Amino acid sequence: MADIDQYILDDSDIAFEYELQKSPSVEVWQRYIAHWEAQVCEDGVRSARHILWLYERMVTQFPTLTVWEQYIGWFRRQYKLDQYLDTFKLYERCINSVKGPLGVFAVEVMLFCISTFDLDIIMKGLQLVLHRCNKDEVERIWNIVLGFALEHVLPSEEGPNNIDFSAFNDRNYEDLRLDIYKLLFLGGDQTEIEDDEEDEDVDKWTASLLRYYLQVANEDKYDETLRLLIRTKDIKIIKECFDLYIFNDKTGKNNRESKKEYDFDLYIYYLDTLDKLRLDKDYKSVFDNLLEKYPQHRVLLTLKLADFHMKRADFDKMEKVLTKALSETVKTNEFIAIYTYHVNFEQAYVETIFDEMRDDPEIQVQKKWKSEMDDHLIILGDLTSRYHLLVNDLKIRQNPNSVSNWLERTTLFEDFDKKCEVFVEAIKTIDPIKVKDKEYGMLGKLWCDYAKVYWSNKSYEEARTIYESATKVPFPDLQDLEIVWHTWAVNEFQIHNIERALKILRKALTVPPSYESIIDRFKSENRRLPSQTILFTSKRLWNYYIDLLESIPTIDANDVIRAYDTLMTLKLITPVGILNYATFLKQNNNLHGSLQVYEKGINMFPPEICYELWTLLLDEVMEPAHQATKERIRELFEQCLQQLGNTDININSIYVKYSDFEIHNKLFSRAIDLLMSGARRPYTNKEQLKQRVDLWESAISKCEEFLGPDSLRQLLSECIQELPNSKAITYVLKFTKLEMSLSDYTRARELLQYGAQLLPPIKNEELWGLWEQFELEHGDKSYYKEMLLLKQKLEKEMKVDTEEVSKGQGNVQFVASSVKNQEAKTNPDEIEIDI
């Protein structure tokens, strides 16, 4: 009763107690508690201890979740986090006394536990509520706890992701030397050193939490959870969970077959875990399994295995692993990674022993270390000296049909026998059909280089055997076969065996019957036929054959002629070949044949080449030595103009040459008519207009030189009407000066008036200057005034460019000298061109 006396202080308390005895209920308890809480606030008669006493009695009598929530809520408001352990005990008592599911109350419990930041409380709370919740609440609770662990507990660095082999070469070189030093001179297992260094960073609490979570998590959460688990660095729990959830090893029988495929980096971390736990047998089992399942990651696994052997000071096995990997990898970046790793290790190994021998006299006298250093110096030297050969090995593995790689390989050996071995290996390996387009010609060169090895050694018969074999290789492209035959012939010529060289070329260039159908078939088959079928079309061999024939003073000229004729029949001759053939015939006094070569060759080439050949032919035929008739020469000129007249080629020189020929024959009018016929041709662009202007200029110049003023007047009249205004103005001035020189001032004034209307005054200053000077010398005041009035009028009216007007309406009317005020014809081809 002493305890009751501490709390029951007045009649109202007794009344509540009596009511609770008579008809106990939660409502009575709540009114009782509210009554005492009021006393705590009003007069301080009561304390929190009194309220606590009532709540304890209420939850004992009515242990429902609602009552407990009211009690815990009051307690937390009263004490906040100062007494969080007592609060947790209340939660614990509540859960143990309440029956049935907790519902959202379980979430409240976990939120409270999280707010304490007490890892033991959080774990106990989690274990307390999980079995009393439904699926949705369990998921929510785990999200809360895992979120807390991720934000506040788990180390911030990320787990493995996109693991690649670059990490091995990113290792600090001095750290590598330190590791080697510990292995060589301190003894022990490198994994022990790593374990000591990592113990401080292990997050055992999160590891235990995640292990607990994996027991209830769906399989689709395994990957994410295992990655979080890796960040805890608790390798024992990591191995345990990987065994259970990746390898499904619940029997303890070391089953290493994963039921579901996970990202490769997870398996790699598991491999690292086995390494750190020194489970070497398991490590090798998993390694072999991964090597079989992930061949695309062979290099990373190889470096892992090399590192594994290094940590156990098993350097011989490490060397074998790296050497084998260097000879098998087919990717450049992988080769670089393995090579760099190997070289760095060997260098660090040698330097570590060297430094220790230098600093420690006891080690200096031990032969073991000197021998170790020498052995690894040899390995290091071999790696560096054979670098280019190793790289070439890699290239050939990447593409055994790459001829350039084999050619490069032949340069890496100086020894005769080894060089020949490379050529033989290359010839056996390369499939001519699989040689890429960009390497056409290289395979033929490789055969020739092989033969050259013997030829340079004066083993001519062996070299000829190689050349003979090369001519039978089914090269898909003609370049390769050309190189073989050409090089063989050149070599024979260089040792003065000219007859053999000619025999080789004649054999290669034998033209088969129905050669046209053979060529067509080769083209249609798209290189599926061997190039031997069209060897006779090789321009390179034909040109060399002809050069060789022409270089022999005693050769029969008919042999050369037959070669040239065959070349023309096959349509393989070049413009230079035409020139050479014509020159050869001319030197052999066959002038008629020389001209015929030009005439035949002209039709074999595009207009640009035709023009050059026509020029040569016309120059040649006009030489006195040919004694060609004038009619024959004119016939050739006409053929030339007819063939080239409708092309875009500038043939002004042909017109001028033809005109000069007629002048030489005293046919001046015909010479000028020829130039005018070229000038009258229609034009469509600036360049063609310039060409026509040049011909008009040439015609006017020759007319002025060889014909009289009347002819010149007629020519200038037509020129002015044919050309656009901007070009015609020059000839208006020329015409004006002609009339002035003949004292026909009226006609000169009419020409000036006409020319003034062709262009705006601002663009026609030369004409206006000439007109003003003309009126001052030959006119009077009225004519001068008319000139000024016309100029003012034109300055106002000619706002639009007269060039534009002339396009649609022709030039300004031109008054011919023979008939006054005659309307000039329009020029429909006139366009505005200002050059």
From Swiss-Prot:
Keyword vocabulary terms for this entry: mRNA processing, mRNA splicing, Nucleus, Repeat, Spliceosome
Assigned GO CC terms: cytosol; Prp19 complex; U2-type catalytic step 1 spliceosome; U2-type catalytic step 2 spliceosome; U2-type post-mRNA release spliceosomal complex; U2-type prespliceosome
Pfam families: HAT_Syf1_CNRKL1_C (PF23231), HAT_Syf1_M (PF23220)
GO biological process terms held by the UniProt record: generation of catalytic spliceosome for first transesterification step
Localization per Swiss-Prot or TrEMBL: Nucleus
Function: Involved in pre-mRNA splicing and cell cycle progression.
Protein known as: Pre-mRNA-splicing factor SYF1
Organism: Candida glabrata (strain ATCC 2001 / BCRC 20586 / JCM 3761 / NBRC 0622 / NRRL Y-65 / CBS 138)
